[in-house]
Amino acid sequence: MARINSNSGTAVLSRGAAVPAARRPASGTSASKISKLSSTGPPNAPWSKSLTIFKTFISVYLGQAACLAASSRISSRCIVCIRSTLFLTLFALNVAQEFVFGATPAPTVKTDLNIRDFSKSSCSALKYRIYVSSFVSVLNIILYVLLFLASVVYIRYLCHQSITTETVKDY
């Protein structure tokens, strides 16, 4: 939201950046667009649907771990390892989603009057920025999938280790 500071004649945006009154547009639609963007986040975040599906998958996996614990087909120490690893992965995904997709989008020419318009075909800065952000998004998804797979492998190792130690204790 934008509010106008009556003492200095500037408009203060929700992020705290002040826009001088001379550079402010005459209509009030700009402030409503800025507040709408900052409250809803970016309209088409490239990988937000994939992250949501991945987080749902982890939540289902957590439910299956709880069912295994209830049926006691697996040792309690192994269940604790599984649940803690899955909670840690879910927490890391939530943090990553906040940092990558954020609650407020990057400023654009329409939302920030101090940004130049690089939309001409002769300038490749906008294309470069799009390519870099897409590459970083893809890399982020790949890294978190690898983190999840590594946690699954580690859980299997811990389960195997707990099974062998319990077998040794019994005999």
UniProtKB/Swiss-Prot annotation:
It is a single-pass type I membrane protein. One of its GO terms (cellular component) is viral envelope. It is found in: Virion membrane; Host membrane; Host Golgi apparatus, Host trans-Golgi network. Keywords: Disulfide bond, Host Golgi apparatus, Host membrane, Membrane, Transmembrane, Transmembrane helix, Viral envelope protein, Virion. It comes from the Viruses. Residues 154-171 are intravirion. Pfam families: Herpes_UL73. Residues 1-132 are virion surface. The chain crosses the membrane at residues 133-153. Envelope glycoprotein necessary for proper maturation of gM and modulation of its membrane fusion activity. Also plays a critical role in virion morphogenesis. Interacts (via N-terminus) with gM (via N-terminus). The gM-gN heterodimer forms the gCII complex. Belongs to the herpesviridae glycoprotein N family. This is Envelope glycoprotein N. It comes from Elephantid herpesvirus 1 (isolate Asian elephant/Berlin/Kiba/1998). The gene is gN.
